[in-house]
């Protein structure tokens, strides 16, 4: 009985320790993801205008003023509120493209890499799909394009680089000259555009980002 009691106490202490460790990890994770970049007023104004814009769950759809069969799916950067990219997407919308912004779980595209599949299924009238993303969103968009090359017509990377084997010939890569960490990872030359004086955070309206050069 004594031996059984000893093992019982040890097992209880072990289980308690594991539970506490899990609780600490969960608390740390939720603290990490709750500290994200918020969209600035200029971005929220686009949403508030209601001009050719509609929110459907985790999707924000910006539609051109006339019918189109071409759309861009956009994955936001890590820990950035999706609405921060609305000014950029609104400009694309005005060129005649449907733009579909995906708000990611916990503001991290890594948790829903294949979100584009669900988007495509919801819009059967769209015949030509492009997938785009900023920073981590670009990396995850690149992964999706690499795994589903027959489903997308092209890939657009902002402050990001190709991840996977999607062809550079079908990819547009745009980065700022002050974003050296991205430039160092670009080992291809096709369709690469450098914005002089540009920084990592300037693709969205969410303020300065830690690590950006002045």
Q: Where do the model's predicted regions map?
A:
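Active-site glycine-rich loops that stabilize anionic/oxyanionic intermediates
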Residues: 76-80, 177-178
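Alpha/beta-hydrolase active-site loop
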Residues: 84, 105-131
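Conserved alpha/beta-hydrolase
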Residues: 89-109
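C-terminal catalytic-base region of ester-bond hydrolases, centering on the histidine
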Residues: 178-214
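Short beta-strand/loop motif that positions the catalytic acidic residue
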Residues: 173-175
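Hydrophobic membrane-insertion alpha-helices, especially the h-region
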Residues: 13-30
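Short beta-strand element of the alpha/beta-hydrolase
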Residues: 69-77
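Gly/Ala-rich beta-loop-alpha elbow adjacent to hydrolase catalytic centers
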Residues: 133-141
């Amino acid at each position: 009985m004594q031996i059984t009691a000893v093992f019982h106490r040890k097992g209880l202490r072990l289980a308690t320790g594991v539970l506490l460790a899990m609780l600490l990890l969960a608390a740390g994770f939720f603290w990490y993801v709750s500290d994200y970049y918020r969209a600035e007023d200029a971005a929220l104004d686009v949403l508030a205008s209601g001009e050719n814009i509609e929110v459907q769950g985790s999707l924000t759809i910006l539609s051109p003023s006339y019918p189109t069969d071409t759309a861009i799916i956009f994955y936001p950067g890590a820990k950035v509120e999706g609405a921060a990219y609305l000014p950029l997407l609104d400009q694309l919308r005005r060129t005649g493209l449907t733009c579909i912004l995906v708000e990611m779980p916990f503001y991290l595209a890594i948790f829903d890499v294949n979100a584009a599949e669900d988007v495509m299924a919801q819009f059967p009238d769209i015949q030509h799909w492009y997938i785009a993303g900023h920073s981590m969103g670009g990396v995850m968009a690149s992964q999706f394009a690499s795994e589903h090359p027959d489903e997308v017509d092209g890939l657009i990377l902002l402050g990001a680089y190709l991840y996977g084997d999607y062809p550079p010939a079908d990819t547009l890569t745009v980065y700022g000259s002050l974003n050296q960490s991205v430039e160092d990872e670009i080992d291809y030359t096709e369709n690469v555009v450098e914005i002089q004086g540009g920084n990592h955070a300037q693709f969205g309206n969410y303020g300065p980002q830690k690590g950006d050069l002045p």
